């Protein structure tokens, strides 16, 4: 089920909120757990056993880790069970056939692919990392093991952040899970509705609209557009315009989903961590990764980079640790070589900055922003290079070897205003304007209501457009 659909906006969300608010205090987590399971099973009920297994493995492992507190060997054994169980399911569904295909291509073997896997369980990369963080934190004694399986299940399967984040650590919400009274307030409800509305607007008014420009240029086979060009016919300037549009689409799509999730969390009385902080205003690649998908970066920093030694064991070890993290970041995003190359690309950029470039970037004013945006956009070209209708080699040939073809002028005339608005929305300017407007209650309510009505009208009048990060 997608947030930006009629069935979610007009049926699932209002019914769930009504049941949740009306439920007795001690049953709220039960209502949240059951409604979230309905949400998860709506599209692919066959993956219900996967979710149940993941919950049980980590729930039981957490209890056993805590129970055998004075027996280190048993604690490590149950942590290993949680890690192997969680990562094993992720590997089976997401990476097994990729490994088999790669082995066949590289080694000349003839391993048969696993039949019946089909589509990837929605959000498996996100909720697997959540359960891993829980089991590791219990092992580290950072949190107490959750003894109520319903409360633990509600944490794992909580629908606002289940499918595409933000990645929420158990310790971020453990107190809120157990505060049955006064969990939410009218102020929280208003803040949540505001965030949800802004996120919905990002998705349907910006991401989907600017994404149409990219679709018109590459000309995917199932595109409803009759004006698409096709990558082979596009000129180099037009391809650059298209990849810039894709960069904007990806940001608004993913940050919009995260904002909607954070907003719904507030409606339910939970404070989820922020996931984006205007990444396209960054003045270095290092800063970009502090602003983009912050919960994923934070997860790798806490559970991989620091345990490997972080910055504490010399420069060579620091670079190696960075290599491991960026490689895993690429692999996390997808079972394909372009994602691995994308991760290694960022490793090289981050290593160069760490070795010598960062001090020079910190002295600059304008050129560091240009440098960062250029490299990020090139990275997104690598990222999208495996999508349907996109030839990785042809895309980079068009980007870096000047070629003629269809001019971008037609598309600039049609999408120029949208491009300008989208670029402005990548900066804190809109937030500053909103901070001025929201001081007046009437203006604040009118603005949110108008934005919600317009966004909802677009949802009603458009076809279903899934979030891009559902693929990961």
Language-model features and meaning:
Residues 1-471:
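Membrane-embedded transmembrane alpha-helical bundles that form the catalytic cores
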């Amino acid at each position: 089920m997608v947030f930006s659909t009629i069935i979610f906006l007009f049926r699932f969300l209002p019914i769930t909120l009504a049941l949740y608010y009306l439920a007795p205090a001690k049953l709220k987590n039960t209502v949240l757990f059951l409604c979230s399971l309905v949400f998860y099973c709506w599209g692919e009920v066959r993956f219900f056993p996967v979710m149940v297994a993941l919950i049980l493995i980590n729930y039981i492992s957490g209890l056993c880790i805590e129970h055998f507190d004075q027996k280190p060997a048993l604690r490590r054994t149950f942590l290993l069970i949680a890690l192997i169980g969680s990562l094993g399911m992720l590997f089976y569904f997401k990476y097994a056939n990729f490994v088999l295909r790669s082995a066949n291509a590289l080694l000349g073997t003839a391993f048969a692919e696993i039949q019946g896997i089909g589509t990837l369980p929605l959000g498996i990369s996100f909720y697997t990392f959540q359960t891993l963080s829980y089991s590791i934190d219990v092992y580290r004694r950072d949190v107490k093991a959750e003894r109520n399986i319903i409360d633990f299940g509600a944490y794992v399967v909580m629908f606002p952040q289940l499918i595409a984040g933000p990645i929420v650590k158990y310790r971020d919400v453990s107190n809120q899970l157990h505060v049955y009274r006064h969990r939410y307030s009218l102020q929280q409800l208003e803040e949540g509705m505001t965030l949800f509305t802004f996120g919905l607007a990002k998705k349907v008014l910006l991401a989907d609209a600017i994404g149409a420009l990219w679709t018109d240029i590459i000309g995917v086979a199932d595109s409803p557009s009759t004006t698409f060009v096709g990558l082979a016919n596009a000129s180099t300037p037009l391809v650059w315009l298209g990849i810039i549009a894709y960069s904007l689409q990806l940001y608004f799509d993913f940050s919009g989903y995260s904002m909607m999730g954070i907003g719904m969390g507030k409606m339910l009385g939970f404070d989820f961590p922020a996931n984006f902080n205007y990444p396209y205003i960054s003045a270095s690649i290092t800063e970009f990764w502090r602003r983009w998908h912050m919960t994923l970066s934070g997860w790798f920093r806490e559970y991989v980079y620091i345990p490997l030694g972080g910055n504490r064991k010399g420069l060579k070890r620091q670079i190696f640790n960075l290599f491991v993290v960026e490689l895993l970041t690429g692999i996390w995003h997808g079972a394909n070589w372009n994602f691995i190359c994308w991760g290694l690309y960022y490793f090289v950029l981050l290593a160069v900055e760490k070795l010598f470039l960062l001090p020079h970037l910190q002295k600059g004013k304008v050129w560091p922003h240009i440098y960062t945006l250029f490299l990020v956009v090139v990275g997104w070209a690598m990222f999208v290079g495996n999508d349907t209708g996109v030839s990785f080699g042809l895309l980079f040939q068009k980007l870096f070897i000047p070629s003629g073809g269809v001019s971008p002028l037609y598309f600039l005339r049609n999408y120029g205003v949208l491009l300008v608005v989208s670029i402005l929305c990548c900066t804190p300017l809109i937030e500053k304007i909103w901070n001025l407007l929201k001081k007046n209650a009437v203006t604040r309510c009118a603005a949110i209501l108008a934005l919600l009505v317009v966004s909802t009208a677009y949802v009603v009048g458009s076809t279903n457009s899934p979030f891009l990060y559902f693929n990961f």
